[in-house]
C-alpha cells in the first residue's frame, strides 16, 4: 500500500513508520475497513474494533470471526494482485474490496475489484516517492475537475479520451492484450 498520509482518517500518525514521504511504499499493507454508505453518500472508514462491533450487530456471535476473515482475505488478495501487477509494470497504490455473504454464510466479492475505478494504479517506470505519481486511473479526471472548480462537472472530450487511454493502457499492461 503506497497511499499518501492524508488517506488514513482512521489511523493515528503514530501507527505509521516515521519519516514516510508522499507515495512511499509501506512496510506492510494497511487494512482500513469501512461501512457501506447509502447511494450518493461516501463510505465511512472505521477502526478494526468498530468493524467487529458493526458486524456483531448483523451477525451476533460472529463479529470477531468475520472481521478477522475479511481482514485476512483482503490483505492476501491485495498482496497476490499487487505482486502480479508489479511483474507487469504497475504499482497498485491502494484499492478497495467489497464483500458480502451468500445464503450459506460464505464470503463473496460484492462489487468490482482491481479496476481503475476502485484502485490507484501507478506505473513502475518513473516511480519516485516524495510527490504524487502519474496514474492509470480516474485520478486524472478528478484532478481536472478539482483544478476547474467553476466547471459544471462536465468533462471536456479530451479529458474523457485521455482517461479512456489511461484505462486501456493499464488493461494492456496487466493482460498483455489489446481491448477490442
Model-identified regions with their sequence ranges:
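Short, small-residue-biased leader/transition segments that mark boundaries at the very start
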Residues: 1-13
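A non-catalytic, amphipathic alpha-helix used as a structural packing/dimerization or gating element
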Residues: 1, 69-80, 162, 166-170
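Anionic ligand-binding catalytic core segments
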Residues: 11-65, 113-174
